[in-house]
Amino acid sequence: MDPTDLSFSPDEINKLIETGLNTVEYFTSQQVTGTSSLGKNTIPPGVTGLLTNAAEAKIQESTNHQKGSVGGGAKPKKPRPKIAIVPADDKTVPGKPIPNPLLGLDSTPSTQTVLDLSGKTLPSGSYKGVKLAKFGKENLMTRFIEEPRENPIATSSPIDFKRGAGIPAGSIEGSTQSDGWEMKSRSLSGAIHPVLQSPLQQGDLNALVTSVQSLALNVNEILNTVRNLDSRMNQLETKVDRILSSQSLIQTIKNDIVGLKAGMATLEGMITTVKIMDPGVPSNVTVEDVRKTLSNHAVVVPESFNDSFLTQSEDVISLDELARPTATSVKKIVRKVPPQKDLTGLKITLEQLAKDCISKPKMREEYLLKINQASSEAQLIDLKKAIIRSAI
């Protein structure tokens, strides 16, 4: 049997409406606190207009009560609001969504009849069958949640709600999420205006919930890797700081090297000057041969002199006791032979000099042989000069 074919008597309709109004008045009579505000952000969409009006009426009633208590007057009883009832329509399509009967608003145009609850007479007409009545009552019991319920409360035994009375256990199920009605509130006072949508766009990257569990196992490894990288970066920064701090020392070393090069150049110049000033003996000519080549000339010796350099048959003019020049016959000069000196130290010195200054092995061996065969100091001196010239 189709439930839409059933009809209700005026008494049953009045009883249903009375039950719904008692429910609404019960919720609107509760004390409004900061956490249970009736703003638009806490009221489910679709019933904002009704609850806002109820909140405003509650505030007005509280204000009138305070004024009446001060003046000592009795509080007048507020008449119940009028509810719009939509007449039954025989052309109802099965499966069509049924609007909320408390709002009195329908997206499709229809005629409405005003029901005055203060009177006892009821106009003709009924809700759209028992399905509409069940829908309205379920919305009242679940705080106007539009999600369909699998086990609705039986209409044969309605619960008697009273103002200020406690709610029996199990009479109201837990609230669930509601998509709300796409309908704006007609009341602008006493309600929070709707919040504008943020212009920020959400990112296109999405994360799958199924991969979270597997990826969570890698979090510790990733964190350890990041910590290791951080420590290595700190070590690198420390090493770079040390290198930068030693840059000044490197510059000092470079300056010292430049100074050493300048000193070496100075020494080379001085050595070259010494070589120029000491040309050495051009040949092996003895002093006696040099004296023979010189012309005869007078030599004045004012003091006592050594006649070892004089030769035989040469006239010498000398001064007598009165400082008069007189000719002096010179006896035959016997050249004095100086005592033999120890040449071992000088030979060792010349051998070391030949090893250090002469790079050619053959020439070095010749000089070493001559040094060992030398028997006089003069020969060793000549070898010394020859070694120095060969080194240059």
From Swiss-Prot:
Keywords: Coiled coil, Phosphoprotein, Viral RNA replication. The keyword Nucleotidyltransferase does not apply. Residues 61-107, 152-182 are annotated as: Disordered. Residues 219-246 form a coiled coil. It comes from the Viruses. Residues 217-280 are annotated as: Multimerization. Pfam families: Paramyx_P_V_C, Soyouz_module. Disulfide bonds: none annotated. InterPro entries: P/V_Pprotein_paramyxoviral, Soyouz_module. Essential cofactor of the RNA polymerase L that plays a central role in the transcription and replication by forming the polymerase complex with RNA polymerase L and recruiting L to the genomic N-RNA template for RNA synthesis. Also plays a central role in the encapsidation of nascent RNA chains by forming the encapsidation complex with the nucleocapsid protein N (N-P complex). Acts as a chaperone for newly synthesized free N protein, so-called N0, allowing encapsidation of nascent RNA chains during replication. Homotetramer. Interacts (via multimerization domain) with polymerase L; this interaction forms the polymerase L-P complex. Interacts (via N-terminus) with N0 (via Ncore); this interaction allows P to chaperon N0 to avoid N polymerization before encapsidation. Interacts (via C-terminus) with N-RNA template; this interaction positions the polymerase on the template for both transcription and replication. Belongs to the rubulavirus/avulavirus P protein family. The N-terminus consists of a long intrinsically disordered tail. The central part contains the coiled-coil multimerization domain (PMD). Forms a four-stranded coiled coil structure. The C-terminus constitutes the alpha-helical domain that binds to the nucleocapsid (N-RNA complex). This is Phosphoprotein. It comes from Parainfluenza virus 5 (strain W3) (PIV5).
